[in-house]
Curated annotation (Swiss-Prot):
<protein>
    <recommendedName>
        <fullName>Histidine ammonia-lyase</fullName>
        <ecNumber>4.3.1.3</ecNumber>
    </recommendedName>
</protein>
<feature type="cross-link" description="5-imidazolinone (Ala-Gly)">
    <location>
        <begin position="141"/>
        <end position="143"/>
    </location>
</feature>
<feature type="modified residue" description="2,3-didehydroalanine (Ser)">
    <location>
        <position position="142"/>
    </location>
</feature>
<dbReference type="Pfam" id="PF00221">
    <property type="entry name" value="Lyase_aromatic"/>
</dbReference>
<keyword id="KW-0456">Lyase</keyword>
<comment type="similarity">
    <text>Belongs to the PAL/histidase family.</text>
</comment>
<dbReference type="GO" id="GO:0005737">
    <property type="term" value="C:cytoplasm"/>
</dbReference>
<keyword id="KW-0963">Cytoplasm</keyword>
<dbReference type="InterPro" id="IPR008948">
    <property type="entry name" value="L-Aspartase-like"/>
</dbReference>
<dbReference type="GO" id="GO:0004397">
    <property type="term" value="F:histidine ammonia-lyase activity"/>
</dbReference>
<dbReference type="InterPro" id="IPR024083">
    <property type="entry name" value="Fumarase/histidase_N"/>
</dbReference>
<dbReference type="InterPro" id="IPR001106">
    <property type="entry name" value="Aromatic_Lyase"/>
</dbReference>
<dbReference type="InterPro" id="IPR022313">
    <property type="entry name" value="Phe/His_NH3-lyase_AS"/>
</dbReference>
<comment type="pathway">
    <text>Amino-acid degradation; L-histidine degradation into L-glutamate; N-formimidoyl-L-glutamate from L-histidine: step 1/3.</text>
</comment>
<dbReference type="InterPro" id="IPR005921">
    <property type="entry name" value="HutH"/>
</dbReference>
<dbReference type="GO" id="GO:0019556">
    <property type="term" value="P:L-histidine catabolic process to glutamate and formamide"/>
</dbReference>
<keyword id="KW-0369">Histidine metabolism</keyword>
Length: 507
């Protein structure tokens, strides 16, 4: 059980919500603030004075006053008219994050929503009755309206859900969870719909995947150093301390740790080679820059996870209703775009190391890492696959946040495209997982070919993990299953956990 303290969520909590089947509870310390916010909205509605989102229309229709007897209908119509998402359903971890983030935002007491509505979301979450939310349809301002509308419609008994992974109607989902359809009161529909929780959930889910891939790439990159008989001198701490970037310093330390005790390295210490290619030698510089970006993005997303991104905001102490723009997801868009660049670079550098390993001139290994080349093609086309994926990622890494299209009759005339920025990270991460799987196979092949010299004790664990599923490549065979099984192990963090470097979300 994870207790959600609104405004004080942690990255480890969020990773567990995404990756484990933990249940959640709202911190009782938040109840008083929630109740004050709900009462403030009720008081404003009773007075009948115009207040955006409470008794007015929305967007370009904000100047339209809504009579008191139509306020509940206004909120219902808002939810139903905004549930216009298209595409495949959001993944289960993303929906779980989305619901937890929405509860945190609402729980700070500035949205004016009753506890009964929040309790219903908690009950659905813990019953594993998750709204079916189409992944496409948000521009990241005014919040993630369409995705959150699909979440909210379920509270009304409308739409679809997944009950323990099986698709069903929202009405059936409520029945299984022991709930009745809700009637939303003044502002509650808007409070549920307005916010950056969809884009932030997508970005967080992919952040955790990219953190795992980063750790895996440290292992695969170190293994490639030994496979290519590369030098460990470029990882000397003194080099990186002179430059001063924290990520570079930490990455170099990880490579030193992973390669410590390598007999392969000792075997060629006095060779004639002066410098290795950049894909080996500059790993701390490139991976360090990636590490800095990942850490920065994590910090931004944690702030957003704890933010109140509703509009308007209720300030119960003064009774004020303030309209602003916290729903604009530009910080999330920038963070996701930076993650895309970092993840694409992780894959691009790994692809270059694969190219180095299969090149006999550069690596000193048999061409394409196979004996009897000619009749056997070895890793020739596995590298082509890695190149295809790395190239695809370069296009996917184009920033989504540099685009904007006006909506709502030009009332909402600049948007963030944060949801797309976060969504395309899924494809980038999947491509990187496959590139790293190919590198791990190629590097393991190269290390085998360095026998009788052995790699380091740390990297021998990686070798054992690979060889538990895939044998040494002696002769050409149907290769795709080898890549698939190692990619699955990459996703399962089998290699990430071998890295000495870890992230805040894993603490």
């Amino acid at each position: 059980m994870i207790t959600l303290t609104p405004g004080r969520l942690t990255l480890p909590q969020l990773r567990r919500i995404a990756r484990e089947n933990v249940q959640i509870a709202l911190d009782p310390a938040s109840f008083a603030a929630i109740d004050r916010g709900a009462q403030a909205v009720a008081d404003i509605a009773a007075k009948g004075e115009p207040a955006y989102g409470i008794n007015t229309g929305f967007g370009r229709l904000a100047s339209t006053h809504i009579p008191h007897d139509q306020l509940e209908l206004l909120q219902k119509n808002l939810v139903l008219s905004h549930a216009v998402g298209v595409g495949e359903p959001m993944a289960r971890p993303v929906v779980r994050l989305l619901m937890a983030l929405k509860l945190s935002s609402l729980g700070r007491g500035h949205s004016g929503i009753r506890r009964v509505v929040m309790d219903a979301l908690v009950t659905l979450f813990n019953a594993d009755v998750l709204p079916l939310i189409p992944v496409k349809g948000s521009v990241g301002a005014s919040g993630d309206l369409a995705p959150l509308a699909h979440m909210s419609a379920v509270l009304l008994g409308i739409g679809d859900v997944f009950i323990r992974g099986e698709r069903a109607s929202a009405a059936e989902g409520l029945r299984v969870a022991g709930l009745a359809p809700l009637t939303l009161e003044a502002k509650e529909g808007l409070a549920l719909l307005n916010g950056t929780q969809a884009s932030t959930a997508l970005a967080l889910d992919n952040l955790f995947a990219i953190e795992d891939l980063y750790r895996t790439a440290l292992v695969s990159g170190a293994l490639s150093v030994d496979a290519a008989a590369g030098s460990v001198k470029p990882f000397d701490a003194r080099i990186h301390e002179l430059r001063g970037h924290r990520g570079q310093i930490d990455a170099a330390a990880a490579y030193r740790s992973l390669l410590d005790g390598s007999a392969i390295n000792v075997s060629h210490r006095d060779c004639d080679k002066v410098q290795d290619p950049y894909s080996l030698r500059c790993q701390p510089q490139v991976m360090g820059a990636c590490l800095d970006q990942i850490r920065h993005a994590a910090g931004v997303l944690l702030i957003e996870a704890n933010a109140v991104s509703d509009n308007p905001l209720i300030f119960p102490d003064t009774g004020e209703v303030l309209s602003g723009g916290n729903f604009h997801a530009e910080p999330v868009a920038f963070a996701a775009d930076n993650l895309a660049i970092a993840a694409a670079e992780i894959g691009a550098l790994a692809e270059r190391r694969i190219a180095l390993l299969i090149d006999a001139t550069l690596s000193g290994l048999p061409p394409f890492l196979v004996k009897d080349g000619g009749v056997n093609s070895g890793f020739m086309i596995a590298h082509v696959t890695a190149a295809a994926l790395a190239s695809e990622n370069k296009t996917l890494a184009h920033p989504a946040s540099v685009d904007s299209l006006p909506t709502s009759a030009n009332q909402e005339d600049h948007v963030s495209m944060a949801t797309f920025a976060a969504r395309k990270l899924t494809d980038i991460a999947e491509n990187v997982a496959n590139i790293l799987a190919i590198e791990l196979l190629a590097a393991a092949q190269g290390v085998d070919l360095r026998a009788p010299h052995a790699t380091s004790p740390a990297l021998q664990h990686a070798m054992k993990t690979i060889r538990a599923d895939v044998a040494h490549y002696d002769l050409d065979h149907y290769f795709a299953p080898d890549i698939a099984v190692v990619a699955r192990r990459v996703r399962e963090r089998a290699f990430a956990t071998l890295s000495p470097l870890s992230f805040e979300s894993e603490q």
